[in-house]
């Protein structure tokens, strides 16, 4: 066995293994699952086939799955046309405004991730830290990137 065990891996594999352990440490099943799947795809040499699709359409597929989850109460009739009146309540109006603002901010976060992919590792580590120390729930890198974009815009005001 080589004395330089870690040099047997490519740098991308080392990053994925690091993320895997951070996910285990932070009890983030999403990070663990994603890291394992990507490592398996690389191991079985499917990366050339699958990674381009994931890079170009993966976020879209993930958002479709998220929307299916969010809209499933409509399909199962747990929410009906009668529930539409709730949008006019104070809570409903706040939710409407928050959804609109969050969509704008998420767009900024997505643009930031596309322009600066090097922030993704920091977003992932920050997510794990939030789970561990703030008892947070991982909501995905797009929202974390949106907050990062806001922080960067605020910082640019002072520079």
Swiss-Prot record:
Keywords: Cell membrane, Membrane, Transmembrane, Transmembrane helix
Record-stated family: Belongs to the UPF0756 family.
Residue stretches spanning the membrane: 15-37, 61-81, 117-137, 138-158
Pfam families, A to Z: DUF441 (PF04284)
GO CC, any one term: plasma membrane
Protein name: UPF0756 membrane protein PTH_1668
Protein source organism: Pelotomaculum thermopropionicum (strain DSM 13744 / JCM 10971 / SI)
Subcellular location per the Swiss-Prot or TrEMBL entry: Cell membrane
Mode of membrane association: Multi-pass membrane protein
HAMAP family tied to this protein: UPF0756
């Amino acid at each position: 066995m080589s004395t330089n065990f870690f040099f047997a891996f490519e740098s991308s594999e080392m990053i994925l293994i690091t993320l895997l352990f951070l996910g285990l440490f932070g009890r983030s099943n999403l990070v663990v699952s994603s890291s394992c799947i990507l490592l398996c795809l690389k191991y079985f040499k499917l990366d050339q086939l699958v990674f381009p699709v994931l890079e170009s359409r993966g976020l879209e597929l993930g958002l479709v799955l998220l929307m299916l989850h969010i809209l499933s109460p409509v399909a199962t009739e747990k929410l009906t046309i009668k529930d539409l009146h709730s949008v006019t309540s104070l809570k409903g109006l706040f939710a409407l405004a928050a959804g609109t603002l969050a969509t704008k901010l998420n767009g900024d976060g997505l643009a930031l991730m596309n322009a600066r992919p090097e922030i993704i590792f920091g977003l992932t580590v920050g997510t794990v830290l939030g789970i561990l120390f703030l008892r947070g729930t991982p909501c995905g890198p797009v929202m974390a990137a949106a907050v990062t974009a806001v922080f960067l815009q605020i910082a640019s005001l002072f520079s």
